[in-house]
Amino acid sequence: MTIDNHRILQPSAANIRAAASALMDGRLVAVPTETVYGLAGDATNERAVAAIFTAKDRPRFNPLIAHFRNLADVAAAARVEARAERLAQEFWPGPLTLVLQRRDPCAIALLASAGLDTIAVRIPAHPVAQALLEAFGRPLAAPSANRSGRLSPTTAAHVAAEFGEEVAMILDGGRCPVGIESTILDLSGERATLLRPGAIAEERLTAAIGPIAQVSADARARAPGMLASHYAPDLPLRLDATGAAADEVLIAFGARVPLGAGLTLNLSPAGDPTEAAANLFAMLREADASGLARIARSEERRVGKECRL
């Protein structure tokens, strides 16, 4: 695949201003966050939000995450109660998304919430995302900058490989330091419910607010990441491999690596789950581009309690 690099720009002050201007015009901009790159549009503009769904080929029933500068901006759009305040104090800015009750009225486009009475909100920690939010002055709807069902992008080049003229520019903040999606926690009801495992382990959330329920398998999507096909590689994936063939890409972890693969990619030779999580999407993309027939994943590992590698 030929990658169009002319839209990849360094996040200088001038380019941040240009990105904010493009967003004001209803265009889309790719922006780095600490988790993955986001496909950002004006969260208050229904047409811009619709353009995100179209560019990603995303089902309209799958809500988007709205990104904010600070807690005061979040509170203007959503009802921030005691549990949310505790989590915000501990984990924001950072890779935690909270699903809260929308305020009425709410400036965020209803399409971003997929017509629900809730809204998914986050304050990103990445300095480029923060700078763009500050320059733009409004919340950004910013799901991962990939076509729906494909691997999430952790570099600007990954975004350029996915999108053409749908994106006005790609702000290059380097490789995303976390490399996996934010954890999503639903606080819109009486019980806190984990909707999507992610960068912040469930144990840390439980320590902050008490017991957390698990989402039921048949629940309607209240936030991104609840579709079975989410973030899948193109190649067939063989799990818990104890060996690998010459036509396979081996995704390994730790010092003990089976031999025989056509290509071996080690998530973390040192066995560090944090390093492995940061490398996961990039290495799956490399595996997809290898020209080999399958991916073999060695013995299952976890990041925290719930994020499997």
What is each stretch, according to the model?
Residues 1-305:
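Active-site-adjacent structural elements in enzyme catalytic cores
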